[in-house]
Regions:
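Glycine/proline-enriched, intrinsically flexible loops and inter-domain linkers
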Residues: 1-174
Length: 174
């Protein structure tokens, strides 16, 4: 589906993404490969590989229709997972685990700039700092666009981020 999505974005972006619009495409991968895993292969994070496929397809299609293909961006989600214990040593010790969703920018598009701090192809934006800080003992000292990280050119890539996170308690984050 991710591969077909990449094809549809370039070949027919005006057509809705559904079973009917994807039916003309056929994609095959060798059995046993990372794209066609065979039981009992571990596939827990297969969505990460899947989210990288549209950029791979774009790289192939750029050879045939370079004026329709966006530049490669930061790719899919870049998540940072923290875990630890609160109030270590007290009777009220709790274990926490949080995944902070962070993103780079998308590549420049053929007729406009890329999107800043947005995962592609999902379009997922980052988790607000306030939500992360309310559910885990962490402090975001800084979360801002990285100036000029979109590169130069007629159309620039979306901006990435600079993020600084620290433990809010006297305990290490894992």
């Amino acid at each position: 589906a991710y591969t077909c999505f990449g094809l549809a974005c370039i070949v027919s972006p005006e057509i809705p993404n559904n079973a009917g619009s994807l039916a003309p495409f056929s994609v095959r991968a060798p059995e046993g490969s990372i794209l066609n895993a065979v039981y009992p292969a571990a596939v827990c994070t297969r969505h990460i590989i899947g989210q990288m496929l549209p950029d791979t397809v774009f790289g192939c299609l750029a050879q045939a229709v370079p004026d329709r293909v966006p530049a490669e961006g930061a790719g899919c989600l870049w998540n940072v997972t923290f875990r630890g214990e609160t109030d270590r040593g007290s009777n009220d010790t709790k274990i926490f685990c949080i995944t902070a969703v962070t993103n780079g920018g998308t590549g420049a598009r053929p007729s406009k700039d890329g999107l800043s701090a947005t995962a592609y192809p999902s379009g997922v934006r980052g988790t607000p700092v306030e939500i992360n800080e309310s559910v885990a003992p962490i402090i975001f000292w800084r979360k801002e666009y990285s100036p000029d990280s979109g590169g130069v050119g007629k159309h620039r890539g979306g901006l990435g981020q600079v993020i600084e996170i620290e433990s809010a308690i006297e305990a290490d984050l894992e």
